[in-house]
Amino acid sequence: MHPPAESDPVRANERLSWAREALADPALDLVRASTDAGFRSYWRTLDHEPSRIVMDSPPDKEDVHPWLRIRALLEAGGVRVPHVLAQDIEHGFLLLEDLGADTFLQVIGDANADDLLDAAVTQLLKLQAIAPPADLPAYDEALLARELRLFDEWFLGRHLGMALDCGDLETLDLVYRRLVDAALAQPQVLVHRDFMPRNLMPVAGGAAVLDFQDAVRGPIAYDPLSLFKDAFLSWPQARVDGWLDRYHARALDAGLPVPSLPRFRRDADWIGVQRHLKVIGIFARLHHRDGKPKYLADVPRFFAYLDGVLPRYPELAPLAALIDGKVKPAIARITEAARG
């Protein structure tokens, strides 16, 4: 199953008709505002004041109920999320306030990063203070392991064409087990799962949070690590360390169950390895299954993150050896082959 093409005339007609009715504006037109890695898309009103956003979630592909549920949960906890002005759940249309055209990813830079990320942490601390509902999915052993397997299935197997021998599989099993155990041992809180600059909007008074529908109960270090070691831009390690320390101090002040700073730093490193491997696999899947090759350009960023962490932990040395000995040579081969 592939995401819809850029132009689906039937769906476009339904979307426009609904927006015109919701806003009582028969002359209204829409222009694409953004899309995501799935099937959801966002459309901005043209020549309508104030500007609004239509979120289009085709019901057979993107159930809008989780988005609405988590939005309400976050709003009740004081997190700044988009306001819903109208909705048609049956057809998957929501009318939202327009928070602007730029996310943190578009506006962040060396000069303003400290202030922007501090605003992001303000929202994150509110999010993590919310008690996860009893029926919220957990970042449990099965989910953590399933995500890790995306790396060997989609990146090593499908993208690189690597045939893993018994020793390779044992290495991955061993390291994956250690990563999963470490994640489960962390204090568990509400986790956004993609708390990063492209899912944060600059608004008056701070930041607004987007793309929260996949929230789970999971490791406390997951979201701050995702924020400071982003999928689409990198920062010097010294700066990342400073932000992690600042988050830790603020989390302590907020009464969140963070461990000691050295333990938190280790937890962030280890859950980062899990996330980096997962995202490498997802980016390969987006290319090969969903026809979205642009994400592959950011894969080297994640190997750089791994290079910075794996050598510090002897328990993760088998993974470092596999990456250096087999994965990087395979990447070099396909890169050379692609150049012709």
Indicate where each model-derived feature is located.
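Conserved NTP-binding catalytic cores of kinases and kinase-like/nucleotidyltransferase enzymes
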Residues: M1-F93, V189, V203-A208, I323-G340
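Active-site activation/catalytic loop segments of kinase-like enzymes and analogous catalytic loops
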Residues: D152-H159, I220-P257, W270-D290, F302-V309
